[in-house]
Amino acid sequence: FNQFVATMDLMLEYNFAKADPLGADYDQGALELACGNVAFWPNGCWAWPNLVEGGADVNGEFGFISFVLGDDTSDFANNMIQASASKQIMVDKVQSTAEQQAAAKEFINYLVYDANGQKMFVEETALIPAAKNNPNAPLDPLGKDIAERTAAGLLYTSCFIAPSDHWSVIGAAMQKYISGNSSKADLASAL
């Protein structure tokens, strides 16, 4: 907890949106990085299209760094990057009709088994497929960086399973802290 808060405090101190961190605009973050006004933008490989739209040099050097937590250089979190499935596709069997479920399954099969769907998934969405049968390699520097780190064993995964009120409860506590309306002790108590 202490290491996480120290890292968050550092990011808040040296941030283009320091004056209003809760008002930071996603598109502005992409522009700031693409134009070279900031060195870091915490995000994932899916942000590549946003960077290109913001004017990033498609041949530029972009990649990921560890999300540093503390001063222990031997800590895996300080030497690797965290990567896990950020997008999940699910079929609703409660509120959707049988026809809608069939269409959803057909779409998933298109993404997983169809050559055009596989290619689109990787090249147009800038995502890295979980399905091992997809032969397409990332074309953008962010996807390439993750693929290289995966091959080198330099990433760790996290399984994000949280209670249904996670965002409303923990998110609210984090927003209070980030906006300067609570202390570190208040944040710890809320979490």
What is each stretch, according to the model?
Residues 26, 43-48, 67, 85-87:
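Beta->alpha turn/N-cap motifs
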Residues 1-22:
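Glycine-centered hinge/linker elements that transmit conformational signals in sensory
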Residues 176-190:
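Short, charged, surface-exposed loops that flank catalytic or proteolytic processing sites
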Residues 65, 121-176:
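Long, aromatic- and glycine/proline-rich binding clefts that accommodate carbohydrate-like moieties
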Residues 14, 54-126:
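Extracytoplasmic/periplasmic substrate-recognition and gating elements
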Residues 35-43, 60:
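Alpha-to-beta junction loops
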Residues 20-34:
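Short helix-initiation/N-cap motifs at beta->coil->alpha
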Residues 28-31, 48-54:
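Pocket-flanking alpha-helical
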